[in-house]
From Swiss-Prot:
Keywords, ordered alphabetically: Cell membrane, Decarboxylase, Flavoprotein, FMN, Lyase, Manganese, Membrane, Metal-binding, Ubiquinone biosynthesis
Transmembrane stretches, start-end: none
GO molecular function, one term: 3-octaprenyl-4-hydroxybenzoate carboxy-lyase activity
Organism: Janthinobacterium sp. (strain Marseille) (Minibacterium massiliensis)
Protein's UniProt name: 3-octaprenyl-4-hydroxybenzoate carboxy-lyase
Gene: ubiD
Cofactor(s) the protein requires to work: prenylated FMN; Mn(2+)
Amino acid sequence: MKYSDLRDFISQLQQMGELKRINVPVSPYLEMTEICDRTLRAAGPALLFEQPTGQKIPVLGNLFGTPHRVALGMGATDVSELRKIGHVLAMLKEPEPPKGFKDIMGLGSLVKSIWDMAPKELRGAPCHDIVWEGNDVDLARLPIQHCWPGDIAPLITWGLVITKGPHKKRQNLGIYRQQVIGRNKVIMRWLAQRGGALDFREHSIVNRGQPYPIAVALGADPATILGAVTPVPDSLSEYQFAGLLRGSRTELVKALGSELRVPASAEIVLEGHIYPDESHPSGYEHALEGPYGDHTGYYNEQDSFPVFTIDRITMRRDPIYHSTYTGKPPDEPAVLGVALNEVFIPLLQKQFSEILDFYLPPEGCSYRMAVVQMKKAYPGHAKRVMFGVWSFLRQFMYTKFIVVVDEDVNIRDWKEVIWAITTRVDPIRDTTLVDNTPIDYLDFASPVSGLGSKMGIDATNKWPGETDREWGRTITMTDEVKKRVDQIWQELGI
């Protein structure tokens, strides 16, 4: 699916019956969350709330509420096509030596396609049609959702945060939630291992005492948003990747108050800085964030994060505010995980050819549990795969549980996975525990915030060297009998 910006994407979704306009007044305070949650659980359409209570700007919700719409956002027509994207990323991440002239030509064509998708910088852009500065900057003028009864304040959820480290050649794009704490202030909740936090940390060391510029794009086109949550190789910018998905170069414009480049077609852009504050150990302004209901289905504990002061807000004429909520699965992050799972598979297989399939169950809060199907070749092989998954992509840094099974187990069928665990696992021999590893700050089950343990479960058939006992043989009916019963089944009248 090809589109130019978020508005074009919305228009095409509506024509396909994948978006519904809501003309009834609906409050951003709790009501939108309940409506979007019910719609997502029913695999319903994206929703455009045209009359948010007390606001003039419409709200777009449930945009990525089905894997199919995620695929459409990534320029595909079906979820199955996402593996092609994974193959492209795998080639870029770990290119093998070309095997012949055809491979050389194919690789050259891919490189040219990526080069042709280098971002295009504009002198003016729709996102600068309207500019709020000074006292006009007031977040209360935006229909920011208050998602759950126990949330401390309204929360910006789909903001595309744009940062740049002092020694980095390109910008980083990330999705980080932002708590509203004032007319022009939000708390930027980014984990220490994420790109935005790393950029800021580098700035605070190299340029301590100087304000750190940030831009937040709300309502960027889907390819750019999804590029920020996809394992794009370091050699490729998210803007280039978005252009590759979209089939057209990503158009950027220089922010009005910094050297950062923002998506030209973004609906709303927040520009500002994290300002120095020598009273804080970091040397920069911080505040206590939370609690908020999150993708685990619980309210998280409070913690300190940097304060982003918004100096100006720019927007398109008649802007659209893109929002979401996070809660007990399924929610949009869980749906994204299901779709991006297809992108991850070729990447993993490129590095570990023994991996046959890979699955992130949506009930596992997007990434906390993974099930791997492998072609086992030697004793201890499953353990190697576990550590490979944990270390290969940053997306799996926080995966707490990995279950590894043989090729005869359908990893997308929990009945088969549970059967493999209960019949092929000895709890002492086949579980691997690793302590003091990075864990999501939102994971309150870990003993220390941001640091906890991981478990690997080897549910494969055991080889000599792993057991001294005669291993069980699975029960299967002969093909001849199955064929015979198929032939007489209708006559049996069962």
